[in-house]
A protein has these predicted regions:
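Specific transmembrane alpha-helical segments of multi-pass solute transporters/efflux pumps
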Residues: 15, 19-20, 48-98, 134, ...
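Hydrophobic transmembrane alpha-helices of multi-pass small-molecule transport proteins
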Residues: 47, 68, 108, 117-139, ...
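Helix-helix packing/entry segments at the starts of transmembrane helices
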Residues: 36-38, 75, 79, 93-100, ...
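C-terminal transmembrane-helix exit sites in multi-pass transporters
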Residues: 46-58, 82, 101-126, 253-273
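Transmembrane alpha-helical segments that form core, pore/gating elements
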Residues: 47, 105-107, 111, 125, ...
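Hydrophobic/aromatic residues within transmembrane alpha-helices
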Residues: 26, 35, 39, 85, ...
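Transmembrane alpha-helices of multi-pass small-molecule transport proteins
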Residues: 27-77, 102-105, 159-164, 181-202, ...
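Juxtamembrane helix-entry segments on the extracytoplasmic side of multipass membrane proteins
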Residues: 1-6, 29-33, 37, 59-65, ...
């Protein structure tokens, strides 16, 4: 992994960490399905503008089935699951659940492509899980009464991400990362559209705070979806599915930070300790060597 790849990984984690904050703010007003419909629609519109600017084509007739698969597993299903759980669970806990995606990814990599699980990768995954446990302090108080089944259900969301990631990896030579991101957003928009009449929530109740809710919706759609997913598919193409999925090890760091700053969630010593362990696990899984930074500097100054 190059320093540029690592920087992209951290920026992407900060953006996606904010998505749980935005969902917690907006989902009480809009409901899970309505919120995610807005999210994928705004993301699709932003990517459409980018495609027009850079003159990228979707080749929709040739690849519409591919986009439907990505739209279902990388957007519609996991997004709705997280939004549904955001009605009950905290943003911090949701960001930790998201961190199980690399574990699912390693299992699926072995089952899908027989990609060997090397000792370094296994150690990194173990450290990542340990770091997540430290971040949350294994505090049962994080779970409200009756929320265990919600937690069990939302664990399916990172599994969907892992499936989509490996599917995208198998098709990356045929389509540009932009096409994957753009096509999947429009597919998710279409997949969720028939569900809206049965979703229950009105688009915006009168009791909601319009500025706060719509600000969260815009942040979720434009920043956490349109921009973030374009960055993510580029990382999949550059690093491979298993390494790109390790961005989710970093997301709890930012998810807890944003939760503390904007939702008043407490941050203890385990946050700092967990962050260190998580970053170490990420380095092991991705194979990043900090010494490459010094090598590049020496070359550039020579």
């Amino acid at each position: 992994m190059t320093p540029a790849n690592l920087l992209q990984l951290i920026i992407l984690a900060a953006i996606w960490g904010a998505s749980f904050l935005f969902m917690r703010i907006a989902v009480p007003a809009l409901g899970p399905v309505w919120l995610i419909e807005w999210r994928v629609l705004l993301g699709a519109l932003l990517l459409a503008l980018a495609g027009r600017w850079f003159r990228h084509s979707l080749a929709l007739r040739a690849h519409w089935r591919h986009y439907l698969v990505l739209g279902l597993f990388n957007s519609a299903l996991p997004f709705v699951l997280f939004a549904w759980a955001a009605q009950t669970l905290t943003a911090s806990l949701l960001s930790v659940v998201n961190a199980t995606a690399p574990i699912w990814g390693a299992v699926i990599a072995w089952a899908w492509s027989r990609e060997p699980l090397k000792g370094r990768v296994a150690a990194g995954l173990a450290l990542g899980v340990a770091g997540v446990a430290l971040l949350m302090g294994l505090d049962p108080a994080m779970l409200k009464p009756g929320s265990g089944w919600v937690l069990a259900g939302v664990l399916l969301a990172p599994c969907c991400y892992a499936i989509a990631s490996h599917y995208a990896k198998s098709a990356r030579n045929a389509l540009l990362p932009y096409a994957n991101a753009h096509g999947s957003m429009w597919a998710a928009t279409l997949l969720l559209w028939p569900v809206l009449p049965f979703a229950g929530h009105a688009p915006l109740p009168e009791t909601a705070t319009p500025v706060l809710v719509w600000g969260a919706v815009l942040g979720l759609g434009l920043l956490c979806t349109g921009l973030a997913y374009l960055m993510y598919f580029r990382l999949v193409a550059a690093l491979g599915a298993a390494s790109a999925l390790t961005v989710t090890f970093l997301i709890p760091v930012f998810g807890i930070l944003w939760g503390h700053l904007f939702l008043g969630e407490a941050v203890g010593w385990q946050t700092l300790a967990g962050a260190l362990v998580v970053l170490t696990g990420t380095a092991l899984v991705t194979g990043f060597d900090p010494r490459t930074l010094w090598v590049r500097k020496a070359v550039s100054h020579g």
